[in-house]
Curated annotation (Swiss-Prot):
This is Glutamine synthetase. Oligomer of 12 subunits arranged in the form of two hexagons. Keywords: ATP-binding, Cytoplasm, Ligase, Magnesium, Metal-binding, Nucleotide-binding. GO terms for biological process: glutamine biosynthetic process. PROSITE patterns: GLNA_ATP, GS_BETA_GRASP, GS_CATALYTIC. It comes from Archaeoglobus fulgidus (strain ATCC 49558 / DSM 4304 / JCM 9628 / NBRC 100126 / VC-16). Its main location: cytoplasm.
Amino acid sequence: MVRRLRGDCMEEVERAKAVLKENNVRQVLCAFADVRGYLQMFSIPAREFVDGSAFENGIGFDGSSVRGFRTIEKSDMVWMPDASSLKIIPWIDDPIQKSAIMFGNVYEAWGTEIADCDPRGYVAKRYEDMLKSEGMSAIFGPEIEFFLFEGVDFTRLSWDMWVSPNGGAGDSWGPPRIMPISSELESGYMIRPKEGYFRPPPEDTTVEYRNELVYYLEQLGIDIEYHHHEVATAGQVELDFKPKQLVDVGDAFYLYKFAAKNIAAMHGLYATFMPKPLYLDNASGMHTHQSLWKGEPFSGEAVFADPDDEYMLSQKARYYIGGLLEHAKALTALCAPTVNSYKRLVPGFEAPIYICWSPRNRSALVRVPMYVKKPSAIRVEYRGVDPSCNPYLAITAQLAAGLDGIKKKIDPGDPLLEDVYELTPAQKRELGVGELPTTLRDAIDHLASDELMQEVLGSHIFDAFMELKIDEWNQYCLYITPWEFMKYFDI
């Protein structure tokens, strides 16, 4: 008998069938994520869900063709639909192309048990269910940043003979690099590097795109709280949506990226979630706000809130922060999982590289926002995340680290109220402020020695992730960059 983790009640299935029929949907895009965090998708005619047995039996596929899933001799797997996640794709009007998207969990052969390679069903859903069994819940609000480019040519390099990355110290040239195309770099109303934050049009060339993206995201059930141009030039933007629980926030992340890329393509543009595409400008992050609740979010008790505390923080919130700091180095492998991620985690670009916590202070890895002084608004923000991550893994790992802090009563120490970037190395040592890993290789080494993270991922995903990331690092180490030719050719 087929077991489903989510959306298996007849009411949800019948609702989904009605939505498909009422909207004359022709195709359903069946979605899931691989271990790396890449969205995977295949199409099934809607009639297979409305009149056929796709909801009951799922859809079989080749798991050996998905990175990190199965080897060829064990390749038969079953995608089981989550009827509650069905959404009509709102920008498709052509009746021939009319489509919906639905997430699902991945099962082993015959559809009898959840596959331990599935980030959504095996990792995120498992932890969400664990919280519910204890009468608890958690919500997460990621601040997803990305760039909107007009074009990019991977075969063309730009360079500047007289530009110094060190303000005149050391080398006096800017290395050859790929330079994306953006009118924000070329027009009379150009935005200079690091001067894009909250810029209005006409300097901000992305506002009409953002307005359109908000329109479609809200039809997909993603309520946007606010959006704006970000710090970097060349079309860096941020759109923040209201917080969601663990599985739903992962689904929303993928819907967000799917919509952002498709709306961009409709206008001949390119949306990229690559963390650091621009040299000497800010990178894209995904600061993740989170809070714990007894019962349901907002209607239950806010676990992190204590009205009598100076920062409105309960002792459990402090222990939660302690857990995040304790596991920060291992978390970095999951939260910043690409070689490019570590071009973001450097001083001088508003990135959190120091392991400490603080209220209001954006130089700390963990920040306690101080906007609204009421229990339901009290939360912690983990800033060491970027949008190249797999949210089902990265956000679940943050939750697990925080819960481990509560379980073990890990004291985070006093908050650091100074600008950490301005402290001397001696001052940081005296205060016990550590640093995040500086390369992907360092991060995966820390992940390898963290037993909690191994428990969160399970042995299969842990081993697959390690293998994929070690291979990625080795590929990078073999590549000879244009910078090396500029630096060393005349030795």
